[in-house]
């Protein structure tokens, strides 16, 4: 949502971020405690088939505008309602809908609670939420309580309490709450998942994930766009602010929540130097960007231990000058795949010595491309969205709902992956001492069916 009450929202958002950070540090004793279930598990939830999926969009700004295009290009999906309090993006949405020759949906734009009118509509089946982080939890919860399935941008929530609340609400209402981790639908990530399922790397031992993406330029976005609200987090939380893009695929490789789960985490941050230096260089001394105390370390490194003993390194750096990377590394007893750039080394079934990287991916694409990408990859690339992963994610969401199949990601995945943010902040504040992950599945991970290779 591009502009929720503009400056007023930005101040309120900063306050909520500070409260979330303080709550996270104050409530670390007993983070692994499992509350009583509010309803039955939604692991593998299947809902009645929908001939048509009626879509309500909350937030059609920098991120959400893409969903207007994607759902207009997916058979069986129809946008029936749109909410955003920024009149400029509402006008843009109206034009896009007209350009597609579609009937105009209902629009809601008056006040911060306008989304409640959208989720109450009878002609909305799913609510897709692409708003600033602090709004993900209340909007997803409201959608489920109104009988809708919630699809929310990353992260799913910002505190352990929020994450448990969304798990409980999903179980109580028997509604889907999917955090839309689009990177799980990238060609490379899907291929590696297929390789892992076919046993190419042997028994899995270790993974590496990251969000390394220089975004200092967003500090110049003051009244609208992502930087207008995202910059403030660097002055409120010292930890991994944005863990899920790299972590989601690695978690799927390892069958997290479906045979294994995150056990505990230890985290450390480097000094926080880059944001302040950038502000001093790019803005006047009395500018608002020079009034912030940037505390989030330029590089955060967290180590996750799983119940089965595997390890995952997760890094976050949106400040230093370096090439983009999500790492996307998975190491097994027979070899390793690493991304950025893609390369592979195998002891058996490789094409050379495992002492040297094989970087010829065309061979491996030809042999291990995921069936879903083989089927939909060309259409996904034509429709765009981070190389097609965004479109493929949306297509798969609609496909599952129309065909009565469980979603590829569920509320337990969103909770576990998002929990890295508050747990890393608490660990950093405590000299890197470990923090336990809650078992959001309440033990169901031990018997849940692993994510399959769908076509």
Curated annotation (Swiss-Prot):
Positions of substrate binding: 211, 230, 242-245, 324
Cofactor list? NAD(+)
Record Pfam families = GFO_IDH_MocA (PF01408), Glyco_hydro_109_C (PF21252)
Family annotation (SUPFAM superfamilies):
NAD(P)-binding Rossmann-fold domains
Q: Which UniProt keywords are given for this protein, alphabetically ordered?
A: Glycosidase, Hydrolase, NAD, Signal
Disulphide bridges in this chain? none
Q: What is this protein called?
A: Glycosyl hydrolase family 109 protein
Q: Which organism is it from?
A: Shewanella amazonensis (strain ATCC BAA-1098 / SB2B)
């Amino acid at each position: 949502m591009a502009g929720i009450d503009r400056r007023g929202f930005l101040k309120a958002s900063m306050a909520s971020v500070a409260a979330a950070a303080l709550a996270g540090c104050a409530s670390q004793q007993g983070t692994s405690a499992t509350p009583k279930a509010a309803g039955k598990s939604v692991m593998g939830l299947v809902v009645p088939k929908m001939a048509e999926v009626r879509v309500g969009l909350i937030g059609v700004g920098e991120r959400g505008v893409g969903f207007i295009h994607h759902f207009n290009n997916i058979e069986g999906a129809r946008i029936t309602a749109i909410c955003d309090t920024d009149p400029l993006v509402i006008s843009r949405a109206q034009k896009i809908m007209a350009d597609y020759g579609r009937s105009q949906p209902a629009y809601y734009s008056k006040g911060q609670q306008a989304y409640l009118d959208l989720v109450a509509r009878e002609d909305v089946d799913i609510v897709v939420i692409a708003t600033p982080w602090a709004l993900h939890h209340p909007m997803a919860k409201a959608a489920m309580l109104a009988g809708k399935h919630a699809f929310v941008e990353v992260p799913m929530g910002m505190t352990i309490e929020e994450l448990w609340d969304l798990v409980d609400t999903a179980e109580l209402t028997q509604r889907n709450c999917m955090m839309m981790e689009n990177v799980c639908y990238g060609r490379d990530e899907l291929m590696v998942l297929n390789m892992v399922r076919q046993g190419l790397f042997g028994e899995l031992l270790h993974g590496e994930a990251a969000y390394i993406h220089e975004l200092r330029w967003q500090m110049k976005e003051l009244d609208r766009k992502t930087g207008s609200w995202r910059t403030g987090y660097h002055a409120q939380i010292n930890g991994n602010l944005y863990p899920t893009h790299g972590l989601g695929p690695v978690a799927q490789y390892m069958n997290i929540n479906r045979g294994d789960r995150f056990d505990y985490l230890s985290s450390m941050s480097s000094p926080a130097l880059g944001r302040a230096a950038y502000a001093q260089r790019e803005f006047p001394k009395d500018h608002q960007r020079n009034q912030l105390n940037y505390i989030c370390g330029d590089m955060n490194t967290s180590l996750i231990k799983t119940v089965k003993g595997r390890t995952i390194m997760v890094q976050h750096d949106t400040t230093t000058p370096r090439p983009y990377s999500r790492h996307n590394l998975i190491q097994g007893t027979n070899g390793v795949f690493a991304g950025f750039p893609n390369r592979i080394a195998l002891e058996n079934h490789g094409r050379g010595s495992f002492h040297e990287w094989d970087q010829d991916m065309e061979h491996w694409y030809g042999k291990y491309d995921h069936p879903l990408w083989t089927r939909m990859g060309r259409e996904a690339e034509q429709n765009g969205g981070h190389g097609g992963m965004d479109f493929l994610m949306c297509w798969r969401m609609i496909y599952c709902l129309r065909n009565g199949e469980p979603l590829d990601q569920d509320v337990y995945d969103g909770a576990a992956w998002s929990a890295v943010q508050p747990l890393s902040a608490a660990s950093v504040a405590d000299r890197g001492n470990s923090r336990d992950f809650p078992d959001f599945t309440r033990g169901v991970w031990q018997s849940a069916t692993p994510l399959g290779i769908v076509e």
